[in-house]
């Protein structure tokens, strides 16, 4: 998909508004146009990402896997348009369609995936590796609410949920077919069969790690890398036996506990429950990531013997240290 003119950009935006929102340009508001713009650019990056991954596999290039509990990505619309070389085209197309480009760019929320210096460092590394044509992937958790929005009420700070995915979710490409299963609790049984050691978890609680990919465009290159974000879901969304008995809250308890893992970045840990949740987040994130990396390596090479030759795992901080 190539968009090299204002007309092509306008046509693409109008088509996205129609098929994704059932809206015309005249009916669309700034939020819808922001999401339509993001979807158009995401389509371009998705095609380039497929080409990048195919080249990496065919050339058997070594890949960097960058793990961080946070990625402070900021706003992506203007950055991606600039990196893809369509910044002026998008700006002019929006203006000609009756929107102020500055308002559209400003309406995008910051992705609630990071907080401070560590998150910004991770985002910069990922941008730089992409610009340098280095095959790389970032990994983190797809936090539903980020940290919080701050409001001052009667001179006091009030923390409110940051629903960044309402608009920012346009950049996320769900990949449910690549879901991994993370096990918590239970016991482990080991046994030998046909000369091989088998390790079987028993009595565990399963949580599904569902990947949502965010494409990362490099500047002045067709190379596109991926930030893989793990969402947490329960394989059993509802206990029908409890629900049928009127135990509505208990029926959803397992589902709610699973989703808590990906609810917020850095939950308060000044109580035992908070400490437990942070540890669950770290284990969930690392387990899903390693399973994904190993699975993809085996699919390409058929063996783990050369894993160290084709993969480099880098951690940004101590939170994903379990990967070691």
Regions found by a protein language model. Name each.
Residues 1-324:
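A conserved ligand/cofactor-binding region detector
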């Amino acid at each position: 998909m190539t968009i090299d003119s204002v007309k092509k950009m306008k046509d693409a935006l109008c088509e996205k508004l129609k098929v994704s929102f059932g809206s015309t340009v005249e009916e669309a508001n700034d939020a819808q146009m922001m999401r339509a713009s993001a979807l158009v650019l995401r389509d371009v990056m998705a095609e380039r990402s497929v080409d990048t991954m195919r080249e990496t596999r065919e050339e058997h290039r070594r890949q960097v896997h960058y793990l961080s509990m946070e990625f402070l990505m900021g706003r992506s619309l203007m950055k991606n348009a600039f990196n893809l070389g369509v910044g002026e085209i998008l700006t002019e197309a929006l203006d000609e369609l009756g929107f102020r480009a500055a308002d559209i760019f400003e309406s995008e929320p910051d992705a609630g995936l990071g907080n401070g210096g560590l998150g910004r460092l991770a985002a910069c590394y990922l941008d730089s590796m992409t610009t340098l044509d280095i095959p790389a992937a970032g990994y983190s958790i797809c936090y539903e609410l980020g940290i919080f929005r701050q409001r001052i009420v009667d001179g006091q700070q009030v923390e409110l949920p940051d629903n960044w995915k309402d608009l920012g979710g346009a950049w996320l490409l769900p990949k449910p077919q690549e879901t991994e299963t993370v096990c918590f609790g239970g016991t482990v049984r080991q046994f030998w069969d046909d000369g091989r050691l088998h390790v079987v978890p028993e009595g565990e609680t399963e949580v599904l790690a569902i990947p949502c990919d965010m494409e990362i465009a490099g500047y002045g290159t067709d190379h596109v890398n991926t930030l893989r974000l793990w969402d947490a879901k329960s394989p059993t969304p509802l206990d029908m036996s409890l629900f049928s008995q009127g135990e509505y809250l208990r029926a959803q308890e397992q589902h709610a506990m699973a989703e808590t893992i990906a609810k917020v970045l850095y939950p308060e840990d000044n109580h035992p429950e908070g400490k437990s949740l942070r540890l669950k987040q770290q284990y969930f994130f690392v387990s899903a990531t390693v399973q994904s990396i190993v699975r993809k390596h085996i699919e390409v090479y058929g063996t783990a013997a050369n894993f160290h030759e084709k993969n480099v795992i880098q951690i940004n901080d101590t939170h994903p240290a379990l990967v070691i």
